[in-house]
Amino acid sequence: MELHLALRASPLPAADPGRRPPPPRGNFATNCTAAINSTHISQEKFRSLDSWVEHNMLTFLKPVEKCWQPQDFLPDPSHLSAEELGDAVREIHERAAEIPDEVWVCMVGNMVTEEALPTYQSLISSVLGGTVAGSTPWDRWIRGWSAEENRHGDLLNKYLYLTGRLDMRQVEKTIQYLIGSGMDVGVGNSILCGFIYTCFQEKATFISHGNTARLAKHHGDTTLAKICGLVAADEKRHAVAYTNLMKKLFEVAPNESMLAFAHIMRAHVTMPASRMFDGRDPRLFTHFSAVTQKIGVYTVRDYGEMLDFFLKEWEISAVVDDLSPEGRQAQEYVCGLPEVMGKMAERADDRRKKLVNVGEPRYIPFSWIFNKQVCV
C-alpha cells in the first residue's frame, strides 16, 4: 500500500523515525489542530457523493473471481510430488541467488509495509466513521479495497520466504512490531486530509513496486518481476480511484480541500511505515529509505514528480471560486512546491555524489538479510 511519501534531501536523515515531526510552520498553519479543523467537510457535502462513489469508484474494484490470487504464482504442494516440489523451490533459489542484497532490503520493506494493512484499514474507517458491516458505498469501497490489498502482502511474504535469502523470523518480527505500534499520520479526523494522504500513498506504492519489478527482471527473476508488477498494477488502479475522488472533492468543497492539501504538504506528516522496527535497529525505516533512494526504488525526484502530477490532475492553479484568503494562500503555497522539490532532488543528487567521491562509503547491517551490510 503506502510508502514513505517524501524523502529528505540527505541520504541518511538525522531524525529518529519514531519521533513525531516538528509542528508545521507558516502564517496559515502554525497550529496543527486548527489547520486540520479548517479542512472538515460538512456531512451534507460528503453524503452528497454517495451516488458518485457508487458509480465512479466502486467500479475500480474487480470481482473476486477475476482477481489473481497468491497461489497462482507459488508451487502447489497439493499438486506436486515431493521431488517436484523440491525442484520448484530450487528453481526459485537459483533465480533469487542473482539478486543483490540491497534489492532484497527494498523488497522486504515494501512487503512489511503491505502487511500492515489492518492499520491502514482502521485509519480510513475511523476517518469515515463507517461500520464493519455497513452497506454505504464508502463502507463497501473500504472493504473491497482492503480485500484486494490483502493479497499483496500474502503473495510477497510467501514468495520471499521460498527464496531462502531472508531471515524470515526477523521479517515476521518487523511486521508484528509495525502493526502493534499503530500509526498517527497527522490527519486527525479530517476526511479530506485522509484521502489526500492516501492518494500519495497509493501513487508512491505503485512507483516503488514498479521499480522493484524492473530490478528483479534486470537480475533475472522474471517470476518475482511479474509478482511486483501485478502488485504495482493494483496500486495504480487504486491510486486512480482515490485521485478521481479528490478531484471530485475539489469541485464539491474547494476551500476545505485546498487547505487539506496544504496541510498534508506542510505538516511533515508521519509516514505509514515510519515506526518500522525489527527489535534491533531503532532507525530501521531511515536506513530502509536510504537504500530505496540509493538504488532508485523511490526517490526525492519521484516524490516531486508525484506532487506535480496531483497539481495538474486536480487543476489546483485553476481553482478560483469559493476560496477564502487562507485558501488562496494555501493554493499559492502548494503551487510553488514543485520548484522547491526540484531543488531538493538536486541537493540529494549532489550529496550522493559527494559521498561517493569523498571518504569511505557507509554500510548498514540489516537483520532481514542475516545482518549482511548494505551500502547506503
From Swiss-Prot:
Protein's cellular compartments: Plastid, Chloroplast stroma
Known pathway: Lipid metabolism; fatty acid metabolism
Enzyme category, top tier: oxidoreductase
Example of a GO MF term: metal ion binding
Family matches, as InterPro entries: Fatty_acid_desaturase-2 (IPR005067), Ferritin-like_SF (IPR009078), RNR-like (IPR012348)
Cofactor binding: number and manner: Binds 2 Fe(2+) ions per subunit.
Residues in coiled coil: none
Any one annotated GO CC term: chloroplast stroma
Keyword RNA-binding belongs to the record: no
Cofactors: Fe(2+)
Tissue specificity field: Preferentially expressed in the flower labellum.
Enzyme Commission designation: 1.14.19.11, 1.14.19.2
Note in the entry: Flowers 9-alkenes and 12-alkenes function as attractants to the pollinator Andrena nigroaenea by mimicry of the bee's sex pheromones.
PANTHER family for the chain: ACYL- ACYL-CARRIER-PROTEIN DESATURASE-RELATED, STEAROYL-ACYL-CARRIER-PROTEIN DESATURASE7
Free-text function comment from the UniProt entry: Converts stearoyl-ACP to oleoyl-ACP by introduction of a cis double bond between carbons 9 and 10 of the acyl chain. Converts palmitoyl-ACP to (4Z)-hexadec-4-enoyl-ACP by introduction of a cis double bond between carbons 4 and 5 of the acyl chain. Catalyzes the desaturation of saturated fatty acid 18:0 and 16:0 to generate 18:1 (delta-9) and 16:1 (delta-4) intermediates, expected to give rise to 9-alkenes and 12-alkenes, respectively.
Listed name of the protein: Palmitoyl-[acyl-carrier-protein] 4-desaturase 2, chloroplastic
Organism expressing this protein natively: Ophrys sphegodes (Early spider orchid)
